[in-house]
Amino acid sequence: MTTVNSNIRDNCKREKAARFLSENLCPDAVLSVASAYFTVQAYDQLREKLDAIASMRFLFGDPDYVNKIDPEKTASKRFAIVNNGLDLKDALRQKAAVKGCAEWIRAKVEIKSVINRALLHGKLYHIAPPGRDSRAMFGSSNFTTRGLGLADSQNNIELNMEITDQRDRDDLL
């Protein structure tokens, strides 16, 4: 698929949201994220870059969102696992990814939650590299494999914009 040169990241013709992170994350950077969802699989695919950052500040949607997705707890767990892109061949690798992610969170991540009746909808990725201007992207991509365009197939079609004005990037924090 050919890509279009643009500051839009849509996981289709205008690059993947993950590319913004991969190209801009660097050792000792501070990453600030606002997202309603976070998956270990997304961390695992960006692990090399994320392990090298100084810290991450994560503004998370209501932590009770899991219960809101299936309040009657009727959804098939098998379906949920398959729908999230997991299968048996990944089970052993997933255990190591979960352990690595937990260690990374304990060492580098500060998590704050939005406790409100309304859901956190806006997403933000702000990178402050040492000694350089910050970088930022905001839009619709959650910190998930499909949201960031990291899935092998069926990535979400998103609408994110890389912010090119330094004043606007500073205002986002």
Predicted regions and their residues:
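PLD/PLD-like phosphodiesterase catalytic module centered on the HKD motif
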Residues: 1-173
